[in-house]
From Swiss-Prot:
A GO molecular function held by the record: oxidoreductase activity, acting on the CH-OH group of donors, NAD or NADP as acceptor
Upregulating conditions: By heat shock, salt stress, oxidative stress, glucose limitation and oxygen limitation.
InterPro entries to which the protein is assigned, alphabetical: NAD(P)-bd_dom_sf, Sc_DH/Rdtase_CS, SDR, SDR_fam
Residues where NADP(+) binds: 11-35
Annotated protein name in UniProt: Glucose 1-dehydrogenase 2
GO biological process: lipid metabolic process; monocarboxylic acid metabolic process
One Pfam family here: adh_short_C2
Subunit structure of this chain's protein: Homotetramer.
Active site: Y159 (proton acceptor)
Amino acid sequence: MYKDLTGKTAIVTGSSKGIGKAIAERFGKEKMNVVVNYHSDPSGADETLEIIKQNGGKAVSVEADVSKEEGIQALLDTALEHFGTLDVMVNNSGFNGVEAMPHEMSLEDWQRVIDVNVTGTFLGAKAALNHMMKNNIKGNVLNISSVHQQIPRPVNVQYSTSKGGIKMMTETLALNYADKGIRVNAIAPGTIATESNVDTKKEESRQKQLKKIPMKAFGKPEEVAAAAAWLVSEEASYVTGATLFVDGGMTLYPSQLE
């Protein structure tokens, strides 16, 4: 637990399930105020709210499309209305998109992933930074990227491109705001055993995926959440512009061991 996080206010986008849910729940354990965001899963958001409150935090949920400015504004307005400020912005919402060879991909399929993953992250960061700058808040922006900011993902060019974009966005924002006391970092998860990750469900795909991971195990959402709590705490006060890989060594090119 990080005592400096007690009473701080965070927005966590896409927090009705998976990694976002785990981060929001961990923030509850840190006794933080959390704005839970969902787009199409109100029951999941309700569950997240309940767990945050059980953990000792305070929470409210908002339905919003993070790829739209009005969606991000609704999140910020809710944070200010209920908790009076914003200290931490976690841009977690992400969309894998369809798998297709690039020459066969529609512009619509490309654009949807870019809109959510890149534009949504930018809009979330922009709103948070604007609030922090106006109010002299030495806050944190945390972007959830992926190992695919470094490892190309076959037949999913839009996803790899979006995560590579998040990497450079994180570093550029960190450079721009470091002297203002605002830290901007990213987490790049590997294969995490969430309810929607099919690679961790079926035995054939499980074994295929495990061969890519030196630790021979899938990550847990709670392990990503632990990294998130550390990065936005004062324990990481000298860390900015960094991507923390939570991947069991997946980016270490395990094929070199063969």
